[in-house]
Amino acid sequence: MKIKLNTVLILSIFLITSCSNVSQKHTSAWDPIEPVNRAVFSFNMFFDTYALEPSTKVYRYIMPDFIENALTRHFNWLKKPGGALNSSLQGKFEEAFNLVINFSINSLALGFINITGENQDIPSSDFDQTLTSYGINPGPYLVLPFAGPTTLRGVGGTLLDGTLDPLNLAGTSNVAKVKATELPIKALNTRAKYFDEINELKYNSIDAYSVFKSVYFQR
């Protein structure tokens, strides 16, 4: 039972991260396969309603706020190396330098404690932003199973961002085990962080698909 639950939560992280880390702002979307996207979206909402949301309710009940906040800081800290590289590729060298310093100092506590005192919630640049800065079009809008809303460019950006995960760069033999533990926790932590916002969109929208798509392109 525990293995099955972990598998469900590992898959669910992709649904949540794609909703919480949207970086591009567009007013319209090219959605050439909307019927397919809507079918996948319905599946994702079913998964969220009957697996992730109930698990998150338990997580919020038993997890103290200070631990939730520490986990959020840790997961944001893990994005700093990739953010530094992407800022450099975009010509934002001062921002890149600050991210390197932030990551280095906070590494003393693995990001769980904000030693630098800076706002850890400020999103780091990602490869989707970098590709945008080089004039690469987003391509078609896609809704992926578990991964949620994205674009063709966003898929490529996500894959590139994954190569800069500090756990992958460390090259340890226990990376798979660490990730298997980290991913379900990240899924619950992120779903808890945006719990009310996601539920508001999901349960109070006439056309949830269109609303989630609009949010993706406007955030």
Language-model-derived ranges and their functions:
Residues 19-36:
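Bacterial Sec signal peptide processing site at the extreme N-terminus
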Residues 36, 66-73, 96-104:
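Alpha-helical scaffold segments that form or flank carboxylate-/histidine-based iron centers
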